[in-house]
């Protein structure tokens, strides 16, 4: 039973009430009684609107299901389908051209193209590491990953391997030649870097000296001009340092004493309360709110044990240099932080309203993450987040412009409660639901004074694609989905629409996650496609990945690329509406079994950690033991995919259950090294995680928009109650 406190007519879980009273309110000018009264007013006015929007979702989905029931199959009438979507209010008329007018936005969002980290806010260590990932060692990122192949004697080994180190140095010198070209010659083989009369002087391998091709790239240095310890440069809006220490282990092996190249990496980071966390009750929510408060105050710390030693990890201070004109130059030492609130779907028992009903969780997140954010806006906060007085909130899983307008209304009401100027709360719009995609222009317009990013989330978007057209027929195999017409159109349409609405120079246009955190060589080859596509940010799973992905923004001038793209529209709504139905279902039994096993294993591997450990995002080995970054979005695809094939008789219930039971020992083996892990097999009837995985598939067609949260939350609460 949850202990509760009466506040403002609300029944507030004591753990949340105490957090607000003892931690979040102190240091602000807010009065406790006024805050709770304001929160109660917001809940009373907006919870019914939230509920009504969810009813519209269900009503529309019901009509779509019925239409497909009468027009099933791959040869459906495209024109009739589009007309039907307009008739039911799914596809709206496109608004007249407009430009967003968001103001007070930090340059990390408006004019800097670079990587964006996403991390679960419930994990303080991850959160601090992500905040500090604004700057990253290129040498470490190359040496410690498969970005440099372990061939020709270049194995990582257990101690420093000079062969590998030399390959790292060579890679870095090639980067310098590209991002920091000299007036003549190459960075390869250089023997010295000094600052002389506000210019860079580089000694080449032959003893001659040269400067920079573009002297304006030099911004400053640390140390002394004739013996700098770090030299700061800028290229394509991103900063980087050449770090020099001839006495260091690496510097000793380098002709110029260079020990590292430090790259500006995770320019922005999303601290996530949504798909990457498992927060099902007041205790979980308060853990996240407390970590977010620490990030906003700049005092979040974590005790870390490594190599038998314990130390305190804290947030980095800003970086200072002597600029070329002799004045002090300061750069932000931390990633600019967004917070991702949950969507409109779920309710939380952290607060019960005056009638004893659970409150929409998204309303709670808006109130309490913004309350915590007040602390980052105080003038005496030396580790403040925004320098323009804004709070940045990502809002996921919205369906169409009415839901975006509701978010804007909610943010306005929260500003009133907290005494903030109008439009302090900025919104990042996740374009990850089909009804938002096809009405994206109207969605942006609904938040035209608040929008600071639009982002394609192809994982959730695929889940919604499958669920929306569940009754239309069997979809293509999961691996073939990326080759379908709709997904390329969706990605291009997002950029086209954002540029036409004036997001360039005012907001981010983002792309999705690289989900294979151990495959950095592949990421270096492939993820350059995101900046080439006109995205001025894209998601990465780790600080190391952020450093390596930053290289792509040195290779591609994103803002120049956006100007090229803006000349012509590349995608149409008609292409987006192409349903990814399989043209033929003559798959072999082996192909069907392989598809079933892959998805069953993926579901079990993720769900067992969610239910048993409360871990919402982790590296989960796939059926081939390749580690994939899984969260609720990947779970949504896998569960909806099997539900679709089951619905249309491609596989049977018996086959699905057999696959789950056969894959359970595979997942158990993959987790065998974890002493806290409880095996899924063989007690399938009593194992709550196994039951949750089964529910997600067998109840998949009836879950709201194919979301996984209702089942996960219910089963996680059940697990916590049994193991209390």
From Swiss-Prot:
E.C. number, please? 2.3.3.9
Task: Please name the CDD domains in this protein's record.
Answer: malate_synt_G
InterPro entries reported in the protein's UniProt record? Malate_synth_C_sf, Malate_synth_sf, Malate_synthase_TIM, Malate_synthG, MS_C, MS_N, MS_N_TIM-barrel_dom, MSG_insertion
User: What cofactor is this protein dependent on?
Assistant: Mg(2+)
User: What's the family?
Assistant: Belongs to the malate synthase family. GlcB subfamily.
Instruction: Give a short account of what the protein does.
Output: Involved in the glycolate utilization. Catalyzes the condensation and subsequent hydrolysis of acetyl-coenzyme A (acetyl-CoA) and glyoxylate to form malate and CoA.
Name of this protein: Malate synthase G
- Per the UniProt entry, what species is this protein from, by scientific name? Rhodococcoides fascians
The opening ranks of the lineage are: Bacteria, Bacillati, Actinomycetota, Actinomycetes, Mycobacteriales
């Amino acid at each position: 039973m949850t202990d509760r406190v009466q506040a403002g007519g609300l029944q507030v879980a004591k753990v949340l009430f105490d957090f607000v009273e003892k931690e979040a309110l102190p240091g602000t000018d807010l009065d406790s009684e006024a805050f709770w009264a304001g929160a109660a007013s917001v809940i009373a006015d907006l919870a019914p609107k939230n509920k009504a929007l969810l009813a519209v979702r269900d009503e529309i989905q019901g009509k779509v299901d019925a239409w497909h029931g009468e027009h099933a199959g791959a040869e459906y009438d495209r024109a009739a389908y589009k007309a039907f979507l307009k008739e039911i209010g799914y596809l709206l008329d496109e608004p007249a051209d407009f430009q967003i007018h968001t103001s007070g936005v930090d340059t990390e969002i408006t004019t800097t193209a670079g990587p964006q980290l996403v991390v679960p806010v419930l994990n303080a260590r991850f959160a601090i590491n992500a905040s500090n990932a604004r700057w990253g060692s290129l040498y470490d990122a190359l040496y410690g990953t498969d970005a440099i192949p372990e061939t020709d004697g270049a194995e990582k080994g257990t101690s420093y391997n000079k062969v590998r180190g030399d390959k790292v140095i060579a890679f870095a010198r090639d980067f310098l030649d590209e991002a920091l070209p000299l007036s003549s010659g190459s960075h390869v083989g250089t023997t010295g870097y000094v600052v002389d009369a506000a210019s860079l002087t580089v000694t080449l391998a032959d003893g001659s000296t040269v400067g920079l091709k573009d002297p304006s790239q030099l911004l400053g240095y640390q140390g002394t001009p004739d013996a700098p310890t770090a030299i700061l440069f800028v290229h394509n809006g991103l900063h980087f340092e050449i770090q020099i220490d001839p006495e260091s282990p690496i510097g000793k092996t380098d002709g110029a004493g260079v020990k590292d190249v430090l790259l500006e990496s995770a320019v922005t980071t999303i601290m996530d309360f949504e798909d990457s966390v498992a927060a099902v009750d007041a205790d979980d929510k308060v853990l996240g709110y407390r970590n977010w408060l620490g990030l906003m105050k700049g005092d979040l710390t974590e005790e870390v044990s490594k190599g038998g030693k314990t130390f305190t990890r804290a947030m980095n201070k800003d970086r200072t240099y002597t600029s070329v004109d002799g004045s002090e130059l300061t750069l932000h030492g931390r990633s600019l932080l967004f917070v991702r609130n949950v969507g409109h779907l779920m309710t939380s028992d952290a607060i019960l309203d005056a009638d004893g009903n659970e409150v929409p969780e998204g309303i709670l997140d808006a109130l309490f993450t913004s309350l915590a954010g007040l602390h980052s806006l105080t003038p005496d906060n030396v580790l403040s987040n925004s320098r323009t007085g804004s709070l940045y909130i990502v809002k996921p899983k919205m369906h169409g412009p009415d839901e975006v307008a509701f978010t804007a209304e909610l943010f306005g009401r929260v500003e009133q409660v907290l005494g903030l100027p109008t439009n302090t709360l900025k919104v990042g719009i996740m374009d990850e639901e089909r009804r938002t995609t096809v009405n994206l222009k109207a969605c942006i317009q609904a938040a035209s004074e608040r929008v600071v990013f639009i982002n394609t989330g192809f994982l959730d978007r695929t889940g919604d694609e499958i669920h929306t057209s569940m009754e239309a027929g069997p979809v293509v195999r999961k691996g073939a989905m990326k080759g379908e017409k709709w997904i390329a159109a969706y990605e291009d349409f997002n950029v086209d629409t954002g540029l036409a609405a004036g997001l360039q120079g005012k907001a981010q246009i983002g792309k999705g996650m690289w989900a294979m955190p151990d495959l950095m060589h592949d990421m270096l080859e492939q993820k350059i496609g995101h900046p080439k596509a006109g995205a001025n940010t894209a998601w990465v799973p780790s600080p190391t990945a952020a450093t390596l992905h930053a290289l792509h923004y040195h290779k591609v001038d994103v803002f120049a690329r956006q100007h090229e793209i803006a000349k012509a529209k590349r995608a149409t709504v008609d292409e987006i509406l192409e349903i990814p139905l399989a043209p033929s279902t003559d798959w072999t039994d082996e192909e069907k079994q392989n598809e079933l096993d892959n998805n069953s294993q993926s579901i079990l591997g993720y769900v067992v950690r969610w239910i048993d450990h409360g871990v919402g995002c982790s590296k989960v080995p796939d059926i081939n033991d390749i580690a994939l970054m899984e969260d609720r979005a990947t779970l949504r695809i896998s569960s909806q995919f099997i539900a679709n094939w089951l619905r249309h008789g491609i596989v049977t219930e018996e086959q699905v259950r057999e696959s789950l039971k056969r894959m359970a020992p595979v997942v158990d083996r993959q987790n065998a090294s974890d002493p806290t892990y409880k095996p899924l097999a063989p007690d399938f009837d009593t194992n709550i995680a196994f039951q949750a995985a089964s529910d997600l598939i067998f109840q998949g067609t009836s879950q709201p928009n194919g979301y996984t949260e209702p089942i996960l939350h219910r089963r996680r609460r059940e697990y916590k109650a049994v193991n209390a």
